[in-house]
Curated annotation (Swiss-Prot):
UniProt cofactor note: Binds 1 Mg(2+) ion per subunit.
Requisite cofactors: Mg(2+); thiamine diphosphate
InterPro entries: Dxylulose-5-P_synthase, THDP-binding, Transketo_C/PFOR_II, Transketolase-like_Pyr-bd, Transketolase_BS, Transketolase_C
Identification of the protein by name: 1-deoxy-D-xylulose-5-phosphate synthase
Keyword hit for Metal-binding: yes
Subunit (UniProt): Homodimer.
Family in the record: Belongs to the transketolase family. DXPS subfamily.
Gene: dxs
PROSITE patterns in the cross-refs: TRANSKETOLASE_2
Residues that coordinate or bind thiamine diphosphate: 75, 116-118, 148-149, 176, 287, 367
One GO term describing the cellular component: cytosol
Amino acids binding Mg(2+): 147, 176
Reaction(s) this enzyme catalyzes, per UniProt: D-glyceraldehyde 3-phosphate + pyruvate + H(+) = 1-deoxy-D-xylulose 5-phosphate + CO2
Amino acid sequence: MDLSLLRSLTGPHDLKSLSPEQVRALAQEVRQEILRVVSANGGHLASNLGVVELTIALHRVFSCPHDVVVWDVGHQCYAHKLLTGRAGRFHTLRQKDGISGFPRRDESPYDAFGTGHSSTALSAASGILSALRYRGKSGKVVAVVGDGALTAGLAFEALLNVGRSCSDLIVILNDNKMSISPNTGSFSRYLSTLTVKGPYQKLKTRLRRALQTVPLVGRPACRALSRLKRSARTLLYQSNIFADFGFEYVGPLNGHHIEDLERVLNDAKKLTRPTLLHVQTVKGKGYPFAEQNPTDFHGVGPFNLAEGIVEKKDALTFTEAFSHTLLNAARTDDRVVAITAAMTGGTGLGLFSHIYPERFFDVGIAEQHAVTFAAGLACAGVKPVVAVYSTFLQRAVDQVIHDVAVQNLPVIFALDRAGAVPHDGETHQGLFDLSILRAVPNINILCPASAHELSLLFGWALAQDTPVAIRYPKALCPPEEDGFSTPVHTGRGVLITRENECNVLLVCTGGVFPEVTAAANTLARKGIFADIYNVRFVKPVDEDYFLDLVGRYRSVLFVEDGVKIGGIAEALQALLNTRHPAPCSDVLAFQDMFYPHGSRAQVLAAAGLSAPHIAARAEWLLAHSVGQIR
């Protein structure tokens, strides 16, 4: 593979001297390198293939980091990273100690704002621009925002404020008709109606350029012409929402035609009012398998590049187990409906959406709306299931409290990607849900350790008239244990016992049950036998039952796949210490820090939650429990 142009770049400034032919060749090289690395490491493929030309045009027109580009969500930043001095490390993408799959301010001065969640770029870019102007600094600020991101309320809040401020922010609307799943809602349909004919755009650009060359009167004439155009449009044409917000709207533009993009971007640089460039791109551009199936190639694991076949695991994942469980529930209870925020495939709702389209609601990237919408459904007698990644539920905490918990409504939250999340880093770890939700009255919190236990606990949740959160990791389901079929008793977990008399009890949440089991096996090989208590219920807890159980052991080690502060392990240890005498105990959980990207095993190891760490701590704890009264 010839990457001579890409490898010759020392930074984005080198792009400005390339000929049009070299620019087109560079775009192909960038695509090939993205395909090569993502096929090996996994990552966000389709979105990155769709913005190659746009990224090149941005760096040819603007001078970063003097000018600032903020990428919304940030998963489409691979070409940006390749062009800003990180091509030599690109093979480490999303790997431990390698470059992140998202913009990171501590990784490069070209990454102006760290992102990972959707719809933040407009607010961040507006803040950066305001600070630059307040400090008397020049430089343009550009926010690159996907059409899917504009389904979130935060984006509209920013649009309203930016348009009202009369700043010179440039917004690039990357319209690929997708967020992760295909876009839904009236705004997506609205974008498809916005068409401005090419000849009109070219005429407007040429006229503006010609007027600007006229001394003294050129720029005032441009402003007068713009006001006249807006007045005429108001009288003669249907309103444009972006123009109504106060933006100069330009588009739609072909997002894969670099020369046109550069011409319009250069024009936008000269404007002194907010400008929105509507750019249409093809998600997965240049790789037929991704163009034909952009949803499957949005976030993808390692795959066969020649055949477009993603590596599949034989074992069942927790997401798949949830999908089967939900379908079984829907077959027997017609009150069950499902809600997602633009994550149909990721949350396992694809099959449900096909079988029960009238009972499936994709609200777009709008977690706040999703939760309150579910609250409304629950008020009207149905059983809503909100399937959402743990990290994205953070975006709707007020709605969980105010609209669901205060009214004690029977909404089920299926929290996927809870605990350690592989490869996506700080913004995507699902570490805070337990601590956040434990503090909220009325909510039950469940942590299944296997596919069968997920099914049992989901059945329990459906029978409740209160909110229930069920959390599970992005991981394969472990083999079933005999104890997992134990009937559900509110507030009680399951004890997995050994034949030998045990002095050690390992208490864990479901997401780390495999690591705790492996640790128990390691201890057994040393002649130290440990029972395992899978808590099942983080909230409520049958305190009397738990205190009676733990009193049988000399030492108790609590292991939790959430943050220690405010978590269940810390709470159970405090409860244990009310017993006199109390067994010797300790807590292993995620510490007060953000955990970077790596495999799930690497993230757990970094937190001291790997099987070797657990076994070593349990052994140490037992050694220091000598003399404890049982």
